[in-house]
């Protein structure tokens, strides 16, 4: 499973949104209805899923689904 698909599954599960709404350009707040607590929980779940720690300064830059995928992909290089 590619990173995008893993991230998408986490978002659908955590936020209860339709999978069709989860695109790389989708904003967590504006398009998916996430609040700051939802985003913090998503970050923790991403950390668990990918076995990493996302520093707060990096987490603050994750505003879209694509941002999350790019960050995860950058860890694998």
Swiss-Prot record:
This is Acyl carrier protein. NCBIfam families: acyl_carrier (TIGR00517), PRK00982.1-2 (NF002148), PRK00982.1-4 (NF002150), PRK00982.1-5 (NF002151). It comes from Staphylococcus aureus (strain COL). Coiled coil: none annotated. The keyword Mitochondrion does not apply. It comes from the Bacteria. Pathway: Lipid metabolism; fatty acid biosynthesis. 4'-phosphopantetheine is transferred from CoA to a specific serine of apo-ACP by AcpS. This modification is essential for activity because fatty acids are bound in thioester linkage to the sulfhydryl of the prosthetic group. GO terms for molecular function: acyl binding; acyl carrier activity. Carrier of the growing fatty acid chain in fatty acid biosynthesis. Residues 1-76 form the Carrier domain. It is found in: Cytoplasm.
């Amino acid at each position: 499973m590619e990173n995008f698909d893993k991230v998408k599954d986490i978002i659908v599960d955590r936020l209860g949104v339709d999978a069709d709404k989860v695109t790389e350009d989708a904003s967590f707040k504006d398009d998916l209805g996430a609040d700051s607590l939802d985003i913090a929980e998503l970050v923790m779940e991403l950390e668990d899923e990918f076995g990493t720690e996302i520093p707060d300064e990096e987490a603050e830059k994750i505003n879209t689904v694509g941002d999350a995928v790019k960050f995860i992909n950058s860890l694998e290089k």
